[in-house]
Protein backbone atom coordinates (compact mmCIF):
# COMPACT_ATOMS: atom_id res chain seq x y z
CA UNK A 1 0.00 0.00 0.00
CA UNK A 2 1.27 3.46 -0.89
CA UNK A 3 1.60 5.75 2.14
CA UNK A 4 -0.69 8.78 1.88
CA UNK A 5 0.10 12.18 3.34
CA UNK A 6 -2.13 13.58 6.03
CA UNK A 7 -4.30 16.15 4.24
CA UNK A 8 -6.26 17.78 7.06
CA UNK A 9 -4.03 20.87 7.41
CA UNK A 10 -3.80 21.33 3.64
CA UNK A 11 -7.57 20.97 3.26
CA UNK A 12 -8.18 23.52 5.98
CA UNK A 13 -5.86 25.99 4.24
CA UNK A 14 -7.46 25.13 0.89
CA UNK A 15 -10.94 25.88 2.26
CA UNK A 16 -9.98 29.23 3.75
CA UNK A 17 -8.12 30.41 0.67
CA UNK A 18 -10.93 29.26 -1.62
CA UNK A 19 -13.45 31.33 0.34
CA UNK A 20 -11.20 34.40 0.14
CA UNK A 21 -10.85 33.93 -3.61
CA UNK A 22 -14.63 33.83 -3.79
CA UNK A 23 -14.82 37.19 -2.03
CA UNK A 24 -12.62 38.76 -4.70
CA UNK A 25 -14.53 37.17 -7.57
CA UNK A 26 -17.93 38.19 -6.20
CA UNK A 27 -16.79 41.77 -5.63
CA UNK A 28 -15.26 42.08 -9.10
CA UNK A 29 -18.34 40.50 -10.68
CA UNK A 30 -20.46 43.16 -9.02
CA UNK A 31 -18.23 46.24 -9.20
CA UNK A 32 -16.74 46.00 -12.69
CA UNK A 33 -20.07 45.91 -14.56
CA UNK A 34 -21.50 48.68 -12.35
CA UNK A 35 -18.47 50.89 -12.94
CA UNK A 36 -18.20 50.27 -16.67
CA UNK A 37 -21.96 50.72 -17.16
CA UNK A 38 -21.73 54.24 -15.76
CA UNK A 39 -19.18 55.24 -18.40
CA UNK A 40 -21.70 55.53 -21.24
CA UNK A 41 -24.88 54.86 -19.33
CA UNK A 42 -25.13 51.54 -21.14
CA UNK A 43 -26.40 48.62 -19.08
CA UNK A 44 -24.42 46.25 -21.29
CA UNK A 45 -21.13 47.22 -19.71
CA UNK A 46 -19.02 44.94 -21.92
CA UNK A 47 -20.01 46.84 -25.08
CA UNK A 48 -18.27 50.04 -23.97
CA UNK A 49 -14.73 48.77 -24.26
CA UNK A 50 -12.46 46.90 -26.60
CA UNK A 51 -11.16 44.02 -24.52
CA UNK A 52 -8.45 41.78 -25.91
CA UNK A 53 -9.31 38.53 -27.66
CA UNK A 54 -9.65 36.23 -24.63
CA UNK A 55 -12.18 38.31 -22.65
CA UNK A 56 -14.11 38.98 -25.88
CA UNK A 57 -14.15 35.26 -26.61
CA UNK A 58 -15.49 34.50 -23.13
CA UNK A 59 -18.24 37.12 -23.41
CA UNK A 60 -19.24 35.89 -26.87
CA UNK A 61 -19.42 32.30 -25.61
CA UNK A 62 -21.65 33.26 -22.70
CA UNK A 63 -23.93 35.28 -24.99
CA UNK A 64 -24.06 32.41 -27.47
CA UNK A 65 -25.04 29.90 -24.77
CA UNK A 66 -27.68 32.34 -23.52
CA UNK A 67 -29.02 32.94 -27.05
CA UNK A 68 -27.97 36.59 -26.97
CA UNK A 69 -29.55 37.35 -23.60
CA UNK A 70 -27.11 39.76 -21.87
CA UNK A 71 -28.77 39.62 -18.46
CA UNK A 72 -26.46 38.04 -15.92
CA UNK A 73 -23.51 37.67 -18.28
CA UNK A 74 -21.10 38.62 -15.49
CA UNK A 75 -22.18 35.73 -13.28
CA UNK A 76 -21.14 33.25 -15.96
CA UNK A 77 -17.67 34.62 -16.63
CA UNK A 78 -14.73 32.78 -15.05
CA UNK A 79 -12.26 34.26 -12.58
CA UNK A 80 -9.69 34.49 -15.39
CA UNK A 81 -11.90 36.99 -17.20
CA UNK A 82 -11.86 39.39 -14.26
CA UNK A 83 -8.10 39.09 -13.92
CA UNK A 84 -7.51 39.55 -17.65
CA UNK A 85 -9.40 42.84 -17.95
CA UNK A 86 -6.96 44.33 -15.42
CA UNK A 87 -3.98 43.67 -17.68
CA UNK A 88 -1.31 46.37 -17.67
CA UNK A 89 -2.25 47.57 -21.17
CA UNK A 90 -5.82 48.35 -20.06
CA UNK A 91 -4.85 51.07 -17.58
CA UNK A 92 -5.20 54.11 -19.83
CA UNK A 93 -7.95 52.73 -22.05
CA UNK A 94 -10.26 51.43 -19.32
CA UNK A 95 -9.16 51.97 -15.73
CA UNK A 96 -7.39 55.32 -15.40
CA UNK A 97 -9.60 57.48 -13.20
CA UNK A 98 -11.94 54.56 -12.47
CA UNK A 99 -9.85 52.00 -10.61
CA UNK A 100 -10.75 53.51 -7.23
CA UNK A 101 -14.41 52.64 -7.92
CA UNK A 102 -13.40 48.98 -7.93
CA UNK A 103 -10.65 49.16 -5.32
CA UNK A 104 -11.62 52.11 -3.08
CA UNK A 105 -8.80 51.53 -0.58
CA UNK A 106 -6.05 51.10 -3.18
CA UNK A 107 -3.21 53.48 -2.29
CA UNK A 108 -2.41 55.98 -5.08
CA UNK A 109 -5.10 54.59 -7.42
CA UNK A 110 -4.27 56.91 -10.33
CA UNK A 111 -0.62 55.88 -10.42
CA UNK A 112 0.45 53.65 -13.31
CA UNK A 113 2.97 52.00 -10.98
CA UNK A 114 0.19 51.13 -8.52
CA UNK A 115 -1.98 49.76 -11.32
CA UNK A 116 0.89 47.64 -12.66
CA UNK A 117 1.40 46.21 -9.17
CA UNK A 118 -2.34 45.50 -8.89
CA UNK A 119 -2.27 43.68 -12.23
CA UNK A 120 0.68 41.52 -11.12
CA UNK A 121 -1.04 40.70 -7.84
CA UNK A 122 -4.21 39.65 -9.65
CA UNK A 123 -2.17 37.35 -11.90
CA UNK A 124 -0.47 35.71 -8.94
CA UNK A 125 -3.81 35.27 -7.17
CA UNK A 126 -5.20 33.73 -10.36
CA UNK A 127 -2.36 31.19 -10.36
CA UNK A 128 -3.15 30.44 -6.72
CA UNK A 129 -6.81 29.96 -7.63
CA UNK A 130 -5.83 27.49 -10.34
CA UNK A 131 -3.68 25.49 -7.92
CA UNK A 132 -6.66 25.21 -5.61
CA UNK A 133 -9.16 24.45 -8.38
CA UNK A 134 -6.93 21.63 -9.62
CA UNK A 135 -6.30 20.27 -6.12
CA UNK A 136 -2.57 20.91 -6.22
CA UNK A 137 -2.48 20.80 -2.43
CA UNK A 138 1.24 20.11 -2.27
CA UNK A 139 1.89 23.28 -4.27
CA UNK A 140 -0.13 25.32 -1.77
CA UNK A 141 2.74 25.11 0.66
CA UNK A 142 5.08 28.09 0.50
CA UNK A 143 2.54 30.33 -1.24
CA UNK A 144 3.14 33.23 1.13
CA UNK A 145 3.41 35.86 -1.64
CA UNK A 146 0.15 34.76 -3.23
CA UNK A 147 -1.62 34.76 0.15
CA UNK A 148 -0.24 38.26 0.85
CA UNK A 149 -1.51 39.37 -2.58
CA UNK A 150 -4.90 37.86 -1.84
CA UNK A 151 -5.17 39.76 1.43
CA UNK A 152 -3.92 42.98 -0.19
CA UNK A 153 -6.65 42.75 -2.85
CA UNK A 154 -9.36 42.12 -0.27
CA UNK A 155 -8.19 45.15 1.75
CA UNK A 156 -7.99 47.29 -1.42
CA UNK A 157 -11.57 46.26 -2.23
CA UNK A 158 -12.54 47.57 1.21
CA UNK A 159 -14.09 44.28 2.24
CA UNK A 160 -14.04 43.31 5.89
CA UNK A 161 -13.51 39.64 6.57
Predicted regions located by residue number:
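Amphipathic alpha-helical interface elements
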Residues: 1-161
